[in-house]
Amino acid sequence: MFTMKKSLLFLFFLGTISLSFCEEERGADEDDGGEMTEEEKRGVLDTLKNVAIGVAKGAGTGVLKALLCQLDKSC
């Protein structure tokens, strides 16, 4: 009876080890996929937002300078 328990415990141990290896491989495959994480999405959106703000500030400055020039007639 003891040898049977020992062999079953050994098989359970081997099954657990092989299952953990399968989960690690599956996790590695999922990480290499084309999906973006929330942090990556946030980083991309922050970059796009900063670029848009910079462009808007540049355009706004140009428009304000043109209006000031027209109002003062100093062009």
UniProtKB/Swiss-Prot annotation:
Keyword annotations of the record: Amphibian defense peptide, Antibiotic, Antimicrobial, Cleavage on pair of basic residues, Cytolysis, Disulfide bond, Fungicide, Hemolysis, Secreted, Signal
Compartment(s): Secreted
Superkingdom, natural source: Eukaryota
A Pfam family: Antimicrobial_2
GO CC, any one term: extracellular region
Known tissue expression: Expressed by the skin glands.
InterPro entries, per the entry: Antimicrobial_frog_2, Frog_antimicrobial_propeptide
Signal sequence region: 1-22
Keyword Secreted carried by entry: yes
Cystine crosslinks: 69-75
Record-level GO BP terms: defense response to fungus; defense response to Gram-negative bacterium; defense response to Gram-positive bacterium; hemolysis in another organism
Maturation-removed propeptide residues: 23-40
Keyword Secreted: yes
Summary of the function given for this chain in its UniProt record: Antimicrobial peptide. Active against some Gram-negative and a variety of Gram-positive bacterial strains. Active against fungus C.glabrata 090902 but not against C.albicans ATCC 10231. Shows hemolytic activity against human erythrocytes.
Family designation: Belongs to the frog skin active peptide (FSAP) family. Brevinin subfamily.
Protein's UniProt name: Brevinin-2SN2
Lineage, broadest ranks: Eukaryota, Metazoa, Chordata, Craniata, Vertebrata
